[in-house]
Swiss-Prot record:
This is GDT1-like protein sll0615. GO terms for biological process: calcium ion transport. The keyword Cytoplasm does not apply. Its main location: membrane. Keywords: Cell membrane, Membrane, Transmembrane, Transmembrane helix. It comes from Synechocystis sp. (strain ATCC 27184 / PCC 6803 / Kazusa). PANTHER family: TRANSMEMBRANE PROTEIN 165, TRANSMEMBRANE PROTEIN HTP-1 RELATED.
Amino acid sequence: MLTAFTAGLLLITVSELGDKTFFIAMILAMRYPRRWVLVGVVGGLAAMTILSVLMGQIFTFLPTRYINYAEVALFLIFGTKLLWDARRIKATANLEEMEDAEKAIASGEKKLKIVPRGWGIVVESFALTFVAEWGDRTQIATIALAASNNAWGVSAGAILGHTICAVIAVMGGKFVAGRISEKTVTLIGGLLFYLFAVVSWWTKIA
């Protein structure tokens, strides 16, 4: 049986590898000192996770049965979308994600106008990461998990998953990106969402 911690950890680790946030962290780490980038990126991801968990807790006043049905439905929708996307992903998908990340960084730097030194790098990394994660499927999935599972477990698992992906992106992102198949990662992500849907149905509804 998947615990809240394990669910959060698996969900984030699989979903975040090779996405836009991953490439934002990788590109920033190639421009600035890695330690400052890592602090900012992990901070932004942790803040988004905590906010998502709090948003999930808001829905706990609803009847548990409705929350459980909504959780299963969301996992099925996300799983289906990811499997559909996996069929259509091109061989150049990673390059497209990197281009999107570069555009997001360029746009963010124009708006922020922060001196790229020390804590300025932390603030830039934090802001770019937080904005990139807003509305992302992992944020919505985290909200769904937190609505019907232990909030502390979901938070700890999701933050650890984000940290693992951030460390990989910052320390060896370029090396890893060349070896990650977005099609494979997306396919695994879709199957994982289906697994969550089945487990949630079996343990909470059936």
